[in-house]
Amino acid sequence: MPTINQLIRKGRVSKVENSKSPALNKGYNSFKKEHTNVTSPQKRGVCTRVGTMTPKKPNSALRKYARVRLSNLIEVTAYIPGIGHNLQEHSVVLIRGGRVKDLPGVRYHIVRGALDTAGVDGRMQGRSKYGTKRPKQSK
């Protein structure tokens, strides 16, 4: 327990909370060739590789992921949600934060229905999360 005098001299230092999606907290100035501290909710990037990986212990699947070089020159691993996708190398994608609990090192999600990423075909519920347009009403 500190004394009053110690608190007057030093004071309490509040903990700094680390970001869970650090690549979204950096911008890049291409003229000055330096990183800037500009935060953004999403970032654009180019896929450098697209593949599948297996999840951690109790689960079993082939989860789709893409390695993405962002516009701030940081390379991250992003999860491709939904069933089926049209991504390949050099596809331009939009990523958002949000980790995948059973894939180590995957801290970002690709936004479906934005830029080169198509929405999920035949999706009827939760369409907004998968970039699917509303189906036409037949009379």
Curated annotation (Swiss-Prot):
<keyword id="KW-0488">Methylation</keyword>
<dbReference type="GO" id="GO:0006412">
    <property type="term" value="P:translation"/>
</dbReference>
<keyword id="KW-0689">Ribosomal protein</keyword>
<keyword id="KW-0699">rRNA-binding</keyword>
<dbReference type="InterPro" id="IPR012340">
    <property type="entry name" value="NA-bd_OB-fold"/>
</dbReference>
<feature type="modified residue" description="3-methylthioaspartic acid">
    <location>
        <position position="102"/>
    </location>
</feature>
<comment type="function">
    <text>With S4 and S5 plays an important role in translational accuracy.</text>
</comment>
<dbReference type="Pfam" id="PF00164">
    <property type="entry name" value="Ribosom_S12_S23"/>
</dbReference>
<keyword id="KW-0820">tRNA-binding</keyword>
<dbReference type="GO" id="GO:0015935">
    <property type="term" value="C:small ribosomal subunit"/>
</dbReference>
<dbReference type="InterPro" id="IPR005679">
    <property type="entry name" value="Ribosomal_uS12_bac"/>
</dbReference>
<dbReference type="InterPro" id="IPR006032">
    <property type="entry name" value="Ribosomal_uS12"/>
</dbReference>
<protein>
    <recommendedName>
        <fullName>Small ribosomal subunit protein uS12</fullName>
    </recommendedName>
</protein>
<comment type="function">
    <text>Interacts with and stabilizes bases of the 16S rRNA that are involved in tRNA selection in the A site and with the mRNA backbone. Located at the interface of the 30S and 50S subunits, it traverses the body of the 30S subunit contacting proteins on the other side and probably holding the rRNA structure together. The combined cluster of proteins S8, S12 and S17 appears to hold together the shoulder and platform of the 30S subunit.</text>
</comment>
<dbReference type="GO" id="GO:0000049">
    <property type="term" value="F:tRNA binding"/>
</dbReference>
<keyword id="KW-0687">Ribonucleoprotein</keyword>
<comment type="subunit">
    <text>Part of the 30S ribosomal subunit. Contacts proteins S8 and S17. May interact with IF1 in the 30S initiation complex.</text>
</comment>
<comment type="similarity">
    <text>Belongs to the universal ribosomal protein uS12 family.</text>
</comment>
<dbReference type="GO" id="GO:0019843">
    <property type="term" value="F:rRNA binding"/>
</dbReference>
<dbReference type="GO" id="GO:0003735">
    <property type="term" value="F:structural constituent of ribosome"/>
</dbReference>
<keyword id="KW-0694">RNA-binding</keyword>
